[in-house]
């Protein structure tokens, strides 16, 4: 980060931090914006060292401007950041990003006017851009595209497979190229022949449209003048390299290389949409996926969507939050609908990582512990149990702490010779006589039982006199052995 942060120093850094991001806003540019711009340039295969000079910033803006109409918010933000940095290098006093863009636009218009005036003043001079250069004899010659450039282009196509970042890479590698150079780059692509056929169809359509808008003038061509290029000439199929150089260096020039490049970029946009079959609705953040990686996948897919910029803005505002995981979604909704992408990424930084998991786990454990403590406290609020001394019979202390003289014998029955644990008072069997009298009958027996009675004898004997049982019979009944539980429960009807 140190090397990236050393782009601005001293007064330039102070001027940079005074510029606001938006007109009337509160946020200003900071050092982290330079670090972010450097990383984005590396993603687009551009040298971050270009940010250190105003000329380098101008070259970066020139490379990014063709893709601004179809680019994502990140690409537009990168262009605006570089434009503001250019004003700082040139010591142009600006207050916000919009004012910086207006200043650069004015400067470009003035530069274009100066170029036109210079061309009108000196028609003998011709422009020279690599790969078309002027040799020692003053002739315009062409230097073929280098093998290193071709290798970089092939590597990008093989690795990225026509992902959205292929277009800025093609624009950077084909700077100043002739139609022949562009065809060489396209011919080096070995695979993806279906995509190449789609690209050829797009080029043929644009060439036919060029021929329709630029009809051939009637009559022969005047001596010393070049014929007007047709669509096939711009595509490099019916024109020679010398004719292409002449058109590009003539006054006024016909930039056949730039025209052909625009056609190729238009075809590449169609291929990118075809090679991105995933819908933006299917881009959802995984439960453990960092928010930054999710945003990268989201905007990469959004870049290939066939929609207007307004629709893409709506998708960004709605789907980016809706398809986030529950942890990030809670944070994003708390920020509100007007939060910027920078605020979202800052708020969700670290969500899903080890630190975040440990923090969430600690909070959950803290809640569980607090719940257990509250339950324990609530359980202790019941009525207090009174203790009673077995020695003196008083409440409030135990027998081992009793100050009264030691009671001899059993504390239950009062007899000597045994202890409470060996006392038989509480071990009386069902039919024994040791049952404690003060407790009454067992709970499974009726306390007051009404003895069943039989109707009087006279009701069956139709008025005959009934005789009372003799005393002799009562004596016999008393002497009979107990053949039932009559002795315990009273008269048993079944025993008679």
Swiss-Prot record:
Q: Where is this region: Interaction with host PPIA/CYPA and NUP153?
A: 187-225
Q: Motif Nuclear localization signal: which residue numbers?
A: 26-32
Region feature (Interaction with membrane phosphatidylinositol 4,5-bisphosphate)? 73-77
Q: Which UniProt keywords apply?
A: AIDS, Capsid protein, Host cell membrane, Host cytoplasm, Host endosome, Host membrane, Host nucleus, Host-virus interaction, Lipoprotein, Membrane, Metal-binding, Methylation, Myristate, Phosphoprotein, Repeat, RNA-binding, Viral budding, Viral budding via the host ESCRT complexes, Viral nucleoprotein, Viral release from host cell, Virion, Zinc, Zinc-finger
Question: What superkingdom heads the lineage?
Answer: Viruses
> Could you tell me which residues carry Phosphoserine?
146
- Which stretches are tagged as biased composition: Basic and acidic residues? 471-480
Q: Which GO terms describe its cellular component?
A: host cell nucleus; host cell plasma membrane; host multivesicular body; membrane; viral nucleocapsid; virion membrane
Please report, in chain numbering, the residue ranges of the motif PTAP/PSAP motif.
452-455
Disordered: annotated segments: 106-126, 436-482
Start and end residues of each stretch annotated as PPIA/CYPA-binding loop: 215-223
What other facts are recorded? HIV-1 lineages are divided in three main groups, M (for Major), O (for Outlier), and N (for New, or Non-M, Non-O). The vast majority of strains found worldwide belong to the group M. Group O seems to be endemic to and largely confined to Cameroon and neighboring countries in West Central Africa, where these viruses represent a small minority of HIV-1 strains. The group N is represented by a limited number of isolates from Cameroonian persons. The group M is further subdivided in 9 clades or subtypes (A to D, F to H, J and K).
- Family note: Belongs to the primate lentivirus group gag polyprotein family.
- Protein name, entry field: Gag polyprotein
Q: Which organism is it from?
A: Human immunodeficiency virus type 1 group M subtype C (isolate 92BR025)
The UniProt gene name for this protein comes to gag
């Amino acid at each position: 980060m140190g090397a990236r942060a050393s782009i601005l120093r001293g007064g330039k850094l102070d001027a940079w931090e005074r510029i606001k991001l938006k007109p009337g806003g509160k946020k200003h540019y900071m050092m982290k914006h330079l670090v972010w711009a450097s990383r984005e340039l590396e993603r687009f295969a551009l040298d971050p060292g270009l940010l250190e000079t105003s000329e380098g910033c101008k070259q970066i803006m020139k490379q990014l401007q063709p893709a601004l109409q179809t680019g994502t918010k990140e690409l537009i933000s990168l262009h605006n950041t570089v434009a503001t940095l250019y004003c700082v290098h040139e010591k142009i006093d600006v207050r916000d990003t919009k004012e910086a863009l207006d200043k650069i636009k004015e400067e470009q218009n003035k530069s274009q006017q100066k170029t036109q005036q210079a061309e009108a003043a000196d028609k003998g001079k011709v422009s020279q851009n690599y790969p078309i250069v002027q040799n020692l004899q003053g002739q315009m010659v062409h230097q073929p595209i280098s093998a290193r450039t071709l290798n970089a282009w092939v590597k990008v196509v093989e690795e990225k497979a026509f992902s959205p970042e292929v277009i800025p890479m093609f624009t950077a590698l084909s700077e100043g190229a002739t139609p022949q150079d562009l065809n060489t780059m396209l011919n080096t692509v070995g695979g993806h022949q279906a995509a190449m056929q789609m690209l050829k169809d797009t080029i043929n359509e644009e060439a036919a449209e060029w021929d329709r808008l630029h009809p051939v003038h009637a009559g022969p061509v005047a001596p010393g003048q070049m014929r007007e290029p047709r669509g096939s000439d711009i595509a490099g199929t019916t024109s020679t390299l010398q004719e292409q150089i002449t058109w590009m260096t003539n006054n006024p020039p016909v930039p056949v290389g730039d025209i052909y490049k625009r056609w190729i970029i238009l075809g590449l946009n169609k291929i990118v949409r075809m090679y991105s079959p995933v819908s933006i609705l299917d881009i959802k953040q995984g439960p453990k996926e960092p928010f930054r990686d999710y945003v990268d996948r989201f905007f990469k897919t959004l870049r290939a969507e066939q929609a207007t910029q307004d629709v893409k803005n709506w998708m960004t505002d709605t789907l980016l939050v809706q398809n986030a995981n529950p942890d990030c979604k809670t944070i994003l909704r708390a920020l509100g609908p007007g939060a910027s992408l920078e605020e979202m990424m800052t708020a969700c930084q670290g969500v899903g990582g080890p630190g975040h998991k440990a923090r969430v786990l600690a909070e959950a454990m803290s809640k569980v512990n607090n719940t257990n403590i509250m339950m324990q406290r609530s359980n202790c609020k019941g009525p207090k149990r009174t203790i009673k001394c077995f020695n003196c019979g008083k409440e409030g202390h135990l027998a081992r702490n009793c100050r009264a003289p030691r009671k001899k014998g059993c504390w239950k029955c009062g007899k000597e010779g045994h202890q409470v644990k060996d006392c038989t008072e509480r071990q009386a069997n069902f039919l024994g006589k040791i049952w404690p009298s003060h407790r009454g009958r067992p709970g499974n027996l009726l306390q007051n039982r009404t003895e069943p009675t039989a109707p009087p004898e006279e009701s069956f004997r139709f008025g005959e006199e009934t005789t009372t049982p003799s005393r002799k019979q009562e004596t016999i009944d008393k002497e009979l052995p107990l053949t039932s539980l009559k002795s315990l429960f009273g008269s048993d009807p079944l025993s008679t």
